[in-house]
Amino acid sequence: MNKKNLTICSFCGRSEKDVEKLIAGPSVYICDYCIKLCSGILDKKPSSTISSAPVSETPSQPSDLRVLTPKEIKKHIDEYVIGQERAKKTIAVAVYNHYKRIRALLHNKQVSYGKSNVLLLGPTGSGKTLIAKTLAKILDVPFTIADATTLTEAGYVGEDVENIVLRLLQAADYDVARAERGIIYIDEIDKIGRTTANVSITRDVSGEGVQQALLKIVEGTTANVPPKGGRKHPNQEYIRVNTENILFIVGGAFVNLDKIIAKRLGKTTIGFSDDQADLSQKTRDHLLAKVETEDLIAFGMIPEFVGRFNCIVNCEELSLDELVAILTEPTNAIVKQYMELFAEENVKLVFKKEALYAIAKKAKQAKTGARALGMILENLLRDLMFEIPSDPTVEAIHIQEDTIAENKAPIIIRRTPEAIA
């Protein structure tokens, strides 16, 4: 539709059909919704942050930015993320430097160092996404997750990269100032490497176009964001968001990257030959810890894109002990959650140590890391959660090793009739 057929608000993009009143000015329109919003902003104290500013040519300057030290950041991450000590330390330093840089800019200091964007390597379920989520929670900044495989360059069927910024803006309740210091996590970034196979013919087959499109917002630009998402069109109004101070974290499994690194280092150096298809996980982790930008370029990432990530770190595959720790130790550990659910029914849920290791072994066999733990427990406890609310005789449930390994029924301890009465 064109303007002759559909008149829209110049500020929020709502059409005349979506509002009660649309007031016309010289070449502009404003709806009753935006008038009320502006009125509310004017009623606030002058020091208040304007939460819906439509334009931001330069990064906004929130004054309440507190920078945690690397040790403080890691300590908070430790409450939720098990293992990955090297990755957590590296990311804590990168995040500290990133927000220290923003704070320096806010105080009009000359800053010579650039953004500390982070590239996380590691297998599925190793904690890449959880680290990014936890960072956002610690820092109290807006956060959003995007899937790189859904993104396309302009002119192809799919999602524009600006829609990632839109989702961050939505997470910030359209507060541009908060969005401009938020965190964006882009998963499956390895799937847009130029050598990646099995992509749809409707997308940029090489993946290079998507990397080029992402490059602009990652390095810092003023993105024109459609308020309602979707594709851009000439008559549309935009919210302008400066991405210079947004922290970008990208992650991917980068399957076979270890072999590219091995080739660079030399086969005799690491003690295996090309015909050994399956390397031990310890060997893979050792190789990925030695990753260089040239390895990522050989994998299929373009040099300009890789160059915007000065922090590249590997998340190692989780061990059995670490998977068991994930079940029980974090603040929001999944076993603690289920124990609380059963406690609300006045039932004590007990996991034997051997049962926890059996669950961890099952998760390791699934090759999806920590992600498999929740599914295993849900399948294990679903029938019990169905029956327990209707059975007041149950006092405790003990999950044994054979409950997991051999699908045997858990031990159920029942109350005496006197206790029920």
Swiss-Prot record:
Record's keyword terms, sorted: ATP-binding, Chaperone, Metal-binding, Nucleotide-binding, Zinc
Which GO biological process entries does UniProt record here? cell division; proteolysis involved in protein catabolic process
InterPro entries the UniProt entry points to:
AAA+_ATPase, ATP-dep_Clp_protease_ClpX, ATPase_AAA_core, Clp_ATPase_C, Clp_protease_ATP-bd_su_ClpX, ClpX_bact, P-loop_NTPase, Znf_CppX_C4
Ranges for the ClpX-type ZB domain? 1-50
Which CDD domains does the entry link to? RecA-like_ClpX
Give the source's domain of life in one word.
Answer: Bacteria
Q: Does the keyword Lyase apply?
A: no
UniProt: ATP binding residues:
P123, T124, G125, S126, G127, K128, T129, L130
Q: Which GO terms describe its molecular function?
A: ATP binding; ATP hydrolysis activity; ATP-dependent protein folding chaperone; protein dimerization activity; unfolded protein binding; zinc ion binding
A Pfam match is zf-C4_ClpX
> What GO cellular component term, any one, is given?
HslUV protease complex
Enumerate the residues binding Zn(2+): C9, C12, C31, C34
Family classification: Belongs to the ClpX chaperone family.
Q: Which HAMAP family match?
A: ClpX
NCBIfam families per the record? clpX (TIGR00382), PRK05342.1 (NF003745)
**Quaternary state and interactors:** Component of the ClpX-ClpP complex. Forms a hexameric ring that, in the presence of ATP, binds to fourteen ClpP subunits assembled into a disk-like structure with a central cavity, resembling the structure of eukaryotic proteasomes.
Q: What does this protein do?
A: ATP-dependent specificity component of the Clp protease. It directs the protease to specific substrates. Can perform chaperone functions in the absence of ClpP.
Protein name (record): ATP-dependent Clp protease ATP-binding subunit ClpX
